[in-house]
């Protein structure tokens, strides 16, 4: 799937949404749906949904920004489309932005979460990070730790990292990076909250690997080159292309400040 922002309103009222609670401890519900297009399974998800207020979050917009960021940094990741659409939930029509992505499994592959794979295969006393090193996932995990620090990903639990296995070809691989909605300023719902948000504060995050501090986890990547590409001052326009009608100027400014300041700290620490 090509990374794209679709601003022309689409009719997606045929999608059937299921309620999935956030694992990050945040209030609200995240709804998901799926369809099949040209034989390929497509997954859809909404930003934070409130039964009374409707869609109140902007997690889907975060997905497209991180998608573009990882393209710049040369990290293998799932591509998203941000779509303006009419949808139906419990008989009520909402107009909102949602995101869509294709199934990353290849034919013959099955998937399991990294936490389940770890529980089934680790040796006693082995940490999740050491297990990933032994399993050959170390480069992937090191890059992930850097990504999660840059965007302050609050929800990299063990099911947000997946292992793909093909029993017929006896192959094993780790899935592209995905699911970055609970990042940046995702829990800010007003301009006052956005403008006062401390972009460098080391908040507690739901990490499967390492500690709950994304900053502390940088110790694992000291002296390592984790990105093939770079983030430069000229990349701002690319990151926020077609988003100026969706996010406020101050919101984009705070995200950009977070990325540039954390990118500076990241480079100083590794």
Put a short name on every predicted segment.
Residues 91-95, 100-145, 245, 265-266:
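ATP-dependent phospho-/nucleotidyl transfer catalytic cores
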Residues 2-112:
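Conserved ATP-binding subdomain of kinase catalytic cores across diverse folds
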Residues 167-270:
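C-terminal catalytic region of ATP-dependent kinase domains
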Residues 68-72, 143, 147, 257, ...:
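A broad, structural surface signal
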Residues 10-20, 130-146, 188-192, 205-217:
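A short, terminal or domain-edge coil/loop segment
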Residues 57, 135, 249, 253:
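Charge-dense, low-complexity intrinsically disordered segments
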Residues 124-189:
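Conserved kinase catalytic-core segment
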Residues 43, 79-81, 158, 174-177, ...:
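A structural signal for short, well-ordered beta-strand segments and their strand-loop junctions
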């Amino acid at each position: 799937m090509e990374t794209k922002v679709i601003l022309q309103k689409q009719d997606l009222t045929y999608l059937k949404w299921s309620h999935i609670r956030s694992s990050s401890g945040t209030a609200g519900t995240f709804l998901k749906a799926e369809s099949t297009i040209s034989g390929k399974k497509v997954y859809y998800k909404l930003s934070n949904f409130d039964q009374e207020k409707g869609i109140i979050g902007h997690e889907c917009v975060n997905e497209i920004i991180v998608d573009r960021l990882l393209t710049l940094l040369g990290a293998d990741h799932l591509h998203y489309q941000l779509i303006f659409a009419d949808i139906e939930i419990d008989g009520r029509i909402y107009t909102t932005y949602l995101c869509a992505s294709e199934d990353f499994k290849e034919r013959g592959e099955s998937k399991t979460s990294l936490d389940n794979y770890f529980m089934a295969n680790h040796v006693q006393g082995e940490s999740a990070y050491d297990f990933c090193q032994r399993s050959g996932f170390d480069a992937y995990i090191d890059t992930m730790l850097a990504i999660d620090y840059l965007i302050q990903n609050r929800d990299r639990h063990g099911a947000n990292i997946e292992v793909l296995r093909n029993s017929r070809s006896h192959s094993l691989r780790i899935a592209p990076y995905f699911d970055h909605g609970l990042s940046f300023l995702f829990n800010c719902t007003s301009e006052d909250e956005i403008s006062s948000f401390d972009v460098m504060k080391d908040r507690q995050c739901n990490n499967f690997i390492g500690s709950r501090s994304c900053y502390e986890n940088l110790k694992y990547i000291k002296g390592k080159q984790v990105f093939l590409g770079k983030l430069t001052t000229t990349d701002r326009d690319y990151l926020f292309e077609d988003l100026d009608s969706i996010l406020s100027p101050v919101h984009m400014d705070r995200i950009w400040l977070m990325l540039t300041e954390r990118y500076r700290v990241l480079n100083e620490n590794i």
